[in-house]
Regions:
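A polyanion-binding, active-site-adjacent surface
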Residues: 3, 15-163, 167-170, 175, ...
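Generic N-terminal amphipathic, Lys/Arg-enriched alpha-helix
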Residues: 1-13
């Protein structure tokens, strides 16, 4: 089926778009958008892919679900629109970057700047009904985003996969650790940040790996 997404991804993922589950998923998502607020806005569902073409990916950060409150989600995991207060997990991410790299906490929680540098900010589920966390889980998005991870694993070398929390860590089973760096820790949520997220040094480790593999480090 026809999906509006960056051409480099379209070429890689067309077989997924043509599978029956994806049509069922698309029908469900269209129905949801027609009945009330769903996040992110429909035009931004594939924002992570559009900002970060397949051959430009250097780092993959895996989230679970889009934010479900108004104005927050814009298709990049953990990121919020300009001018929106930082959700707790994002605040903790910026704290870790500050502690790890000595960078000041930014004024904006919009991580588009990371995506443009090759950081794929991938939620496992790409849509959510307003106010209902997890409401679009188990509808097919996970099958689709797993195929994205497998495609990156097989089609690229020397990537960094950052997996926070038990949900994301399970995705590590699809990644060849002989060819890619896999960084795992607790989730940045306030419930777990002090149990292994703070002090994980993932941002400096990712940059060290990229430099060692001839890539430009990310300006986190």
């Amino acid at each position: 089926m026809e999906v509006r997404i960056d051409p480099s991804w379209k070429e890689r993922l067309q077989t997924e778009f043509d599978k029956p589950y994806f049509k069922t998923l698309t029908d469900f998502v269209r129905e949801e958008y027609s009945h009330g607020p769903v996040y992110p806005p429909a035009r931004l569902i594939f924002n992570a892919f559009d900002l970060c073409p397949f051959d430009k990916v250097k780092v993959v950060i895996i989230g679970q679900d889009p934010y479900h409150e108004p104005g927050q989600a814009h298709g990049l995991c953990f990121s919020v629109n300009e001018g929106i207060p930082f959700p707790p997990s994002l605040r903790n991410i910026f704290k870790e970057i500050s502690d790890d790299l000595g960078k000041p906490v930014p004024v904006s929680g919009d991580l588009t700047r990371w995506a443009r540098q090759g950081v794929l900010l991938l939620n496992a589920t790409l849509t959510v009904r307003a106010g209902l966390a997890g409401s679009h889980q188990g509808r097919g998005w996970e099958e689709f985003t797993d195929s994205v991870i497998r495609e990156l694993n097989a089609g690229r070398d020397g990537l960094v996969f950052i997996l926070w929390g038990s949900y994301a860590k399970k995705k590590g089973a699809m990644i060849d650790r002989n060819r890619h760096l896999v960084l795992c820790s607790a989730h940045p949520s306030p419930l777990s940040a002090y149990n292994g997220f703070f002090g994980n040094h993932h941002f400096s480790q990712a940059n060290d790996w990229l430099v060692a593999h001839g890539e430009k480090p990310v300006d986190w």
